[in-house]
């Protein structure tokens, strides 16, 4: 996230000269066809997920399960550390990337897929949907939103990821409102977001942000504090896949491993997000 932004812990125009029925148009048709199936799968059993503004921010609170989710716009410095840590612990994570990321790091995407992780959308152009000071207004039209999402899924398709493998997405900046969630759902895509409270999403902050900066130790201790007070059942815990070079204290380098070990000792299981949400897929992922 850019420097001017404050992490939130509460709850491009696209044109083509190709023929009308291009890959994007085909994808529009495909997403529409898949929408009913995806929603049917999600509603197959009683929905115990927790929603905020139409997005899932927590899975079944009665289950001692945590889902690790990672987002990235254009940075991938955590790739080796994160992939190796998850592999060591036998955990399948969920990774949400922008279109730029898919274009910059195809080999990393391939690695993640080969390891059996879910790889999905973080939008194509990393658009800011609403002003930070007014969540109820919009900076994008529905048409702009849909074109951006279709372009995102086209980039995913080129990487070998079908819609059925990733019918969920984390919005850019982890920031959305009810209207965005409704537009996404109309396309057959469910918004998901991190569970607020632990401040794990503040792992991108840099020392020059002053009082807004959160060290890895602070974040780890905050997670443990929340666990002790109310538990982490059903939490979607977000960690950034890469952060600014000005942040040398990378959470994924040492604290991710420590966090997993500690929470496992406390009896938590790390559950793939689609399984935790209750969406079944025929994918090998």
What are these regions (language model features)?
Residues 9, 31, 70, 121, ...:
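Pocket-edge structural micro-motifs
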Residues 45-137, 151-167, 259-262, 278:
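Active-site beta->alpha N-cap acidic-glycine motif
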Residues 42, 53-54, 230-233:
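Feature targets compositionally biased, intrinsically disordered low-complexity regions
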Residues 103-104, 128-238, 242-269, 273-285:
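Catalytic domains of cell-wall/extracellular-matrix polysaccharide-remodeling enzymes
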Residues 15-18, 22, 70, 140-144, ...:
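Short, surface-exposed alpha-helical recognition segments that flank or form part
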Residues 1-41:
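Aromatic (Trp/Tyr) and acidic
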Residues 18-32, 80, 150, 178, ...:
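A structural signal for well-ordered alpha-helical segments within the folded catalytic domains
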């Amino acid at each position: 996230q850019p420097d001017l932004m404050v992490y939130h812990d509460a709850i491009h125009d696209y044109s083509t000269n190709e023929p009308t029925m291009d890959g994007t148009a085909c994808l529009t048709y495909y997403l529409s066809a898949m929408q009913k199936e995806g929603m049917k799968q999600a509603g197959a059993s009683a929905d115990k997920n927790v929603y905020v503004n139409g997005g899932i921010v927590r899975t079944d609170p009665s289950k001692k399960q945590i889902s690790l989710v990672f987002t990235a716009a254009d940075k991938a410095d955590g790739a080796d550390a994160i992939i190796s840590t998850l592999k060591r612990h036998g955990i399948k994570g969920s990774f949400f990337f922008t279109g730029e990321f898919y274009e910059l790091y195809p080999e990393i995407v391939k690695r993640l897929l080969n390891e059996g992780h879910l790889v999905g959308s973080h939008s194509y152009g990393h658009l800011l949907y609403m002003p930070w000071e007014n969540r109820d207004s919009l900076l994008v039209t529905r048409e702009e939103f849909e074109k951006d999402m279709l372009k995102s899924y086209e980039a995913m398709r080129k990487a070998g990821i079908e819609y059925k493998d990733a019918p969920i997405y984390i919005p850019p900046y982890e920031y959305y409102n009810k209207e965005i969630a409704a537009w996404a759902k109309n396309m057959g895509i469910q918004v998901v977001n991190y569970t607020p409270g632990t401040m794990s999403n503040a792992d991108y902050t840099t020392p020059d942000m002053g009082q807004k900066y959160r060290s890895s130790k602070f974040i780890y201790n905050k997670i443990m504090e929340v666990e002790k007070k109310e538990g982490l059942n059903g939490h979607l815990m977000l960690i950034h896949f890469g952060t600014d070079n000005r942040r040398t204290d990378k959470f994924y380098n040492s604290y991710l491993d420590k966090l997993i070990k500690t929470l496992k000792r406390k009896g938590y299981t790390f559950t793939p997000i689609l399984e935790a949400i209750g969406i079944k897929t025929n994918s090998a992922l």
